[in-house]
Amino acid sequence: MKFLVLLFNILCLFPILGADELVMSPIPTTDVQPKVTFDINSEVSSGPLYLNPVEMAGVKYLQLQRQPGVQVHKVVEGDIVIWENEEMPLYTCAIVTQNEVPYMAYVELLEDPDLIFFLKEGDQWAPIPEDQYLARLQQLRQQIHTESFFSLNLSFQHENYKYEMVSSFQHSIKMVVFTPKNGHICKMVYDKNIRIFKALYNEYVTSVIGFFRGLKLLLLNIFVIDDRGMIGNKYFQLLDDKYAPISVQGYVATIPKLKDFAEPYHPIILDISDIDYVNFYLGDATYHDPGFKIVPKTPQCITKVVDGNEVIYESSNPSVECVYKVTYYDKKNESMLRLDLNHSPPSYTSYYAKREGVWVTSTYIDLEEKIEELQDHRSTELDVMFMSDKDLNVVPLTNGNLEYFMVTPKPHRDIIIVFDGSEVLWYYEGLENHLVCTWIYVTEGAPRLVHLRVKDRIPQNTDIYMVKFGEYWVRISKTQYTQEIKKLIKKSKKKLPSIEEEDSDKHGGPPKGPEPPTGPGHSSSESKEHEDSKESKEPKEHGSPKETKEGEVTKKPGPAKEHKPSKIPVYTKRPEFPKKSKSPKRPESPKSPKRPVSPQRPVSPKSPKRPESLDIPKSPKRPESPKSPKRPVSPQRPVSPRRPESPKSPKSPKSPKSPKVPFDPKFKEKLYDSYLDKAAKTKETVTLPPVLPTDESFTHTPIGEPTAEQPDDIEPIEESVFIKETGILTEEVKTEDIHSETGEPEEPKRPDSPTKHSPKPTGTHPSMPKKRRRSDGLALSTTDLESEAGRILRDPTGKIVTMKRSKSFDDLTTVREKEHMGAEIRKIVVDDDGTEADDEDTHPSKEKHLSTVRRRRPRPKKSSKSSKPRKPDSAFVPSIIFIFLVSLIVGIL
């Protein structure tokens, strides 16, 4: 019986599990809301349904306002249906107007966040995609001229041409509404120097509501609109001196608390003739508001304003009414005061003027005239071409040889415009920015580059860079500005004439006349220096470097005048001039090992002892040298008038093989002699093996005979390299390893092997290891490579020598390419059934299969045509349950 009950429970489980798929509809209630149809042509401005005109980011909307509980299922325009849905009511709707005529619309359903967009074409409304709606909305915004993008500073609650401001008081709380005007777009909201909100690239601030107590911002509501026309709200509250975002519920609950809460303050008296700086904040005057601002520190509040013994203002109820800011205009002449109060609606502002030494009540019109008068006095202009220091501080500066000017306004002055002739570079736009500094770069007597620094009310600077192209100024980026600065600095540098250029054009001998040149301290006129520059000045500059290169004078070369008395009158050192051209060729002998044993080497004209001889002009081989300077040893050179203009004078200093490092001739003698000794000893100690017969492509050359492949004039080694390798050069003759390209050992070679200077032989010697070509290595199979133990090598007697295998460059290249080939072979394509696919790459043809080796063990191939699709695991669940039930019933029976 127990088994039957268990079976019954199992059978009843399946309908219960399937019940999850059923949708249980709620029981309809008897109180059904009526379906409402709304006509957008209705002129109703209040009630359960009406349209509220809204202007956001330059586009005008008609926003549908409905009371809770009203369900709108149809929106029409007269007899034309815009939207209709019998099942789901709308949540919100807005009509976009163009020239006061409906143009587009969007509808948002109650339970669907996706918007539905409509476009009016003629007399019909048709749905359109979101992209098309946004594109047309962007066209409407582009038709409106955008005058400025600005940041809203809530601490400056004054009228501005960029936004409208409406304020109202309730108890001690002041509510201010800021709305940007048409053409001006607000992107950021901040208070003093604290940033509160910054809109995204596709968002704009349409309105801001702030709640203040005095000048302290406590609560904030920011209205934001995006590209789709959707409005959102951002709420912020002052918590621990920081503006933290809060929810809409917190915002609504905080407003009554602010109105009912009366923050206690301490009454204080303000004496404008003697201000107590401890209890008040002081604000500077600006062009927009040219008044000196006085603000009491928290928690104090001004209840009485006096000027010495004269009382200007006194609160009637000090516990409730007070002044939270005083602005003082023009202390010297016809002063005026503006008091910002927290009471006495609707103005909340009082004005006072000083007439004939007595303070009297004034009006806002008088204050406006006073502000205009002060603005005219503060305003000044900046002409980048003619800078006046009357109202500006002009400081000339230099960067290298580049001249530029830093211009700042003097105290109580403001630059309102920067221009160049009739072209305006910058002008004052309003409260948000003012010019603090200007850098003007001048080239060739005219301004070329201008850098303007505009300071905003927040701690941030806006830099404007402009460059003059032709007759107009163009605004550039900071990177381009940096590049222009570098160009101007490079252009302004005074480039000194090159020494080589002077030497090539003006290379002469000693000065004319028997008188020695004057010393460094002797003053002479500029005309005399120009006359003697060709004969005396230029050789002096090159005399010092020549002495330094010869190793005889170690002092650094200085000005030309300092070398006049020390170089030019000394005629005994003039024969040293040609030594410089021959010194680079002395290392020719170490380059070739053949020449050290020549008996003519000690008397060769390239001998290191040559600098001591003064009979150089008598040498017969001297005129043959193409780089030999003949002019320095000519005794007629000092009196030759054409010698400085000779074009052949720069040959010796411009020799490309001239040593760049000073070199001592005595040191070269010692090193050269030591090299000869080492080479002679090497020749005597080395025992050469018998020369075996070679093939036709290799010809042996005796040591003493020159070869056709080895030229007589071998390129010399530079002295700098020769000096660097002084400790290694003598050992390289003994330890120089001459091997084949395979890196295998070879028989001893003579030091002057002609293989250095002759082309490589095409054949191989029996005693040399056979080097296979790279193509032969690639043709070997994998089995041949693995079974090869080494290569065949024969010694000088012809006996085969078995050596261990070492990987040469060819072997590494061959193995790498074999591995790459094997990787291509192992590429197997598998189909859905797990078998190899029948493609040509996986199963190559007969010819292709013979040339490659499959590294993978073969397995039986299954035909892809006969394969059946596998059943999913869920298909076996009914079979398993059926088997389980059958077995259970059988067990019970």
Curated annotation (Swiss-Prot):
Protein name per its UniProtKB record: 104 kDa microneme/rhoptry antigen
Sorted UniProt keywords: Cell membrane, Glycoprotein, GPI-anchor, Lipoprotein, Membrane, Repeat, Signal, Sporozoite
Membrane topology: Lipid-anchor; GPI-anchor
Disordered as annotated region, ranges: 492-666, 681-799, 818-873
Propeptide position ranges: 874-893
Natural source organism: Theileria annulata
GO CC terms of this entry: plasma membrane; side of membrane
Leader sequence segment: 1-19
